[in-house]
Amino acid sequence: MLLAKGGLHDGDYRFKEIIGSSQRAACLASGECDAVPLSQPEDVVFARKGFVKLGDSLEVVPNLQFNVIAARRSWAATHANAMVALARAFGATFRFLRDPAHRNEVVRAIVETTGADATAARAILALYYEPDRGVMPKQGEMNMSGVAAVVALLGTAGRIPPPLPPAERFVDLRYLHEAGLQ
């Protein structure tokens, strides 16, 4: 979709499967790859090195559920208290991340966990929150229209056969409801 938005069509490029943003970054840095999808902080770091950002996935899919925590339904059902506690912890974490009063602490955490510098960490936060692009939950809630967009993308890629199931097939909201987050 992003390639088509840029005017490229099938046959204009070839794909090479490289799993992991840091591995794709290494392919780009070595010159073996001409362009690669990168996540943060690699995209910020490479832009600062002079590489050109060709686009952003949010340009073509602005409403997408990016991250989830998955558990087997059978395990979750027998560990409901842990599921609710985890949901509450995630809610507190996302509220903390969004609060500008904690920005410096969040920047330090990004630096410590990713190895990026503070400038890159601030750029990552700006990407998500300045303005708020709806990428990250406000308090750990599930973006069901974003899940539906993921299902549609998987259908387009042939990973889920038609007819496409509803997003609710893949998500059990009871723990988020019990935690007061959904």
Annotate each PLM feature.
Residues A148-Q182:
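Conserved C-terminal helix/tail region of periplasmic/extracytoplasmic solute-binding proteins
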Residues G20, L58-E59, D172-Y175:
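Residues that form or immediately flank small-molecule/cofactor binding pockets and catalytic motifs
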Residues I18, D43, V61, R169-F170:
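Positions that flank functional sites
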Residues L8-D10, A116, R159-I160, L181:
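Helix N-cap/coil-helix junction residues
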Residues Q23-T114:
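Pocket-lining segment of extracytoplasmic ligand-binding domains
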Residues L3, F46, I110-V111, L154-G155, ...:
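Hydrophobic alpha-helix position signal
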Residues M1-R48, M144-A149:
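Bilobed "Venus flytrap"/periplasmic-binding protein-like clamshell domains
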Residues A77-P161:
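Secondary-structure end/capping motifs
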